[in-house]
């Protein structure tokens, strides 16, 4: 049975770092798939964008088509190996927040777990300000908290349509990255039973 763990969190929460470190410690090899990368590859192929950060400004219907194509590719990959799906539950666009996984997309992927990485708005804002590699929108701490709240609500909706379990992992400056990584490893190691 395919085993897919979705890992999500708003930009600057530390999701990529936690994911990278956890994958070095799992009992089984996971294929790390970035949902945005799959969408970006398809968008470039169609001549829609040149830079990844332009995707969130595409027409929502175009984004949904890209999402569905990416979901189909994930299902193909998960037939052969467990997938850790690095993604965003919601995407802030100029028109409002877009669900990262409309109903037909989440029903296609059917993840086993949805892991949400969270931190305080001030921690996220500080991390964003230190990350000069990305062209991120500027948000206030209140907007950051709203985005995290929307991610939780989206995860509940996704779980309703996929029977996934939800795990929230906190990545606070004082808690330590190590603890967050260990929590993710525990979830990922559940895949061992599926691929033995």
UniProtKB/Swiss-Prot annotation:
Localization, UniProt: Cytoplasm
Keyword Ion transport found: no
Any one Gene Ontology cellular component term annotated for this protein: cytoplasm
Reaction equations catalysed: AMP + ATP = 2 ADP
Keyword annotations of the record: ATP-binding, Cytoplasm, Kinase, Nucleotide-binding, Transferase
Signal peptide region: none
The EC number(s) this enzyme carries: 2.7.4.3
Keyword check for Lipid metabolism: no
Residues that, per the record, bind ATP: 9-17
Family recorded in the similarity comment: Belongs to the archaeal adenylate kinase family.
This protein's name: Adenylate kinase
Source organism per UniProt: Thermococcus gammatolerans (strain DSM 15229 / JCM 11827 / EJ3)
